[in-house]
Amino acid sequence: MANNFDYVGDFCEGFAVVKKDYKYGYINTKGEQAIECKFDDAMGFNEGFAVVLKDGKCGYINTKGEQAIECKFDGAGYFNEGFAAVKKDGKWGYINTKGEQAIECKFDDAKYFYEGFAAVKKDYKWGYINTKGEQAIKCKFDYAMDFKEGLARVEKDAESYTINTSGNFIVLDEDKNEFIEISKEFDGACNFKEGFAGVKKDRKWGYINTKGEQVIECKFDRASYFYNGFARVVKGYKWGYINTKGEQIVECKFDGACDFEEGFASVRKDAESYTINTSGNFIVVDEGKNKIEI
C-alpha cells in the first residue's frame, strides 16, 4: 500500500492522509483510496472533519470527501468540542461545524477548545475564552496550556502556576497535603508552608495565610517558603530574613542565604561564607568548638 504513495500518514478516525504526485488525499483502513489526491495539503480527521488546503486557502471536508466548509481561511485547526480555530486577515477566531463564524477573528493566536475553554493570545499575552466567546480568564500570561480535569498550567515572568476555570491559582498546603484556591487578583502564588504562601503582585512578593488574607505586604523582589518560622527574602539583589509577622529580623545585605536550622543559618557575602543567628549576628567557633556570637 505505502509503495503506491509518496507519503502515508497515521490513521485518524478511519482515514490516513496520503500524498501522490504532490497532491494529498485519503485512504481507508483497507488501503482503498477513499478521497482523491487533489488537495495541496491535508490534515487528519477529527470530529468528522479534516482541514484541506487549496490554492493557498484552508477549508474542511467531511469523511465522504465533500467540501463541507469552503476553502477561504488563511489558517485552520482541527475541530474539537464542535469548534475550530480559523485565521482571517492575520487574526484568529472560531467557526462551528456548519462553517458559521461563532467567535470573531480578533486574537493573535488561538488553541483548541478543551472542557469548554480555549487558550487565546492577545497583545503577546495568553488567557482563556468560553464557547460563547466571552473572556473567561484575562490575557495576562506568557503561556497557557489546555484545561484538563478543571485545571491548566500557565506561565508568567518565567514562573509556572496551576489555575482553575475561574482563573484562581491552585496551590498545595505542604503541611496538610491539600489544595487551596488563591485569588486571581494576584499575579502568581506559591505553595503553602507553615501556614503561609508567597504571592506576587505588580512584580513584588508578599505572603497570605490559609484564609487568603494578605498578612505580609508585597514588597520583596523574591520570597522563599517559611521554614522554622523564618523566610528568606530579597530586596535590591540582597538576601535577608523576615519572621511570620513580616518583621525584618535580618537586614537584606547578603549575596546568598540558606534557611535557619536550630537557630543558625549560612549566608554569603563578597564571596565569603558566614554563620549567623536569628538576630543576624555572626557566629564563630573557638578552639574548643564553642559557638561565639559577634
Give residue ranges: language-model regions:
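Residue-level detector of conserved, function-critical positions
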Residues: 1-294
